Amino acid sequence: MTQQSLTLSLKKIYSGKVRDLYEIDDKRMLMVASDRLSAFDVILDDPIPRKGEILTQISNFWFNKLAHIMPNHFTGDSVYDVLPKEEADLIKDRAVVCKRLTPIKIESIVRGYLTGSGLKDYKQTGTICGLKLPENLVEASKLPEAIFTPSSKEEVGNHDINISYAECEKLIGSDLAAQVKEKAIALYTEASEYALTKGIIICDTKFEFGLDENGTLTLMDEVLTPDSSRFWSVDTYQAGTNPPSFDKQFVRDWLENSGWNKQAPAPKVPKNIIQKTVDKYQEALDLLTK
């Protein structure tokens, strides 16, 4: 289930890094998660088998679990309501019928721990997205509280850029920015407390929000998956290290060490790295949902 292998009777209206969207009508669309993998904003040639199915199951778990915090993109329809049976059978585990929403023009990132681009910013300025942090934090330090650190939404192929909350207010308006920040932190806080009981630390995550036709803020796209988040194992976590994560980190680390310049095309990823990645995605699903 890679770029070109799927043909549906619905019209494809968008192809993203991982997900493809198909038009159902003016209120609904079909979102299909492929097995494509992107790293450093480049889509790799090598798919990760079953990744789309695992991601969809993790997302659906969280959408349901967090539905009391805010509305989400579910319509209540099944793929069998909108596709012929033979097509629905093919994609039932990797597709969702969702509301057509107007996406909000920022990436809504919440961080509970210090790593990644946040760590780089902190080392240079002592801040992330303009937020002052305590001194002497190290890689993987737990932050005193979860922080909202938005970034700009760039086109596929360009890197998103961390922005301050004031810039976020300029982009989407102060009322909406306040709502997004409050909901993003509430979602992260509840999810991270639950995940901890299952042996997973959610280091940071990216939420996607949209507005419905009434202007209601709605959670959309994917939620708290190993693609949109960094998951660490409680067992291997140690501040001052770069804890291994339940996601494409195997691939990212391999690419980092390959000498690749992070421009397309990416080098071919070895089979054992791909298998380790599949196993990690599956482990995250099993831990969270069992």
UniProtKB/Swiss-Prot annotation:
Secretion signal span: none
Any single biological process term in GO: 'de novo' IMP biosynthetic process
Annotated coiled-coil segments of the chain: none
This enzyme's EC code(s): 6.3.2.6
Catalytic function, reaction form: 5-amino-1-(5-phospho-D-ribosyl)imidazole-4-carboxylate + L-aspartate + ATP = (2S)-2-[5-amino-1-(5-phospho-beta-D-ribosyl)imidazole-4-carboxamido]succinate + ADP + phosphate + 2 H(+)
PROSITE patterns: SAICAR_SYNTHETASE_1, SAICAR_SYNTHETASE_2
Keywords: ATP-binding, Ligase, Nucleotide-binding, Purine biosynthesis
A Gene Ontology term for the protein's cellular component: cytoplasm
GO molecular function annotation: ATP binding; phosphoribosylaminoimidazolesuccinocarboxamide synthase activity
InterPro entries: SAICAR_synt/ADE2_N (IPR028923), SAICAR_synth (IPR001636), SAICAR_synthetase_CS (IPR018236)
Involved pathway(s): Purine metabolism; IMP biosynthesis via de novo pathway; 5-amino-1-(5-phospho-D-ribosyl)imidazole-4-carboxamide from 5-amino-1-(5-phospho-D-ribosyl)imidazole-4-carboxylate: step 1/2
Family of the protein in this entry: Belongs to the SAICAR synthetase family.
HAMAP family: SAICAR_synth
Name listed for the protein in its UniProt record: Phosphoribosylaminoimidazole-succinocarboxamide synthase
Gene name for this UniProt entry: purC
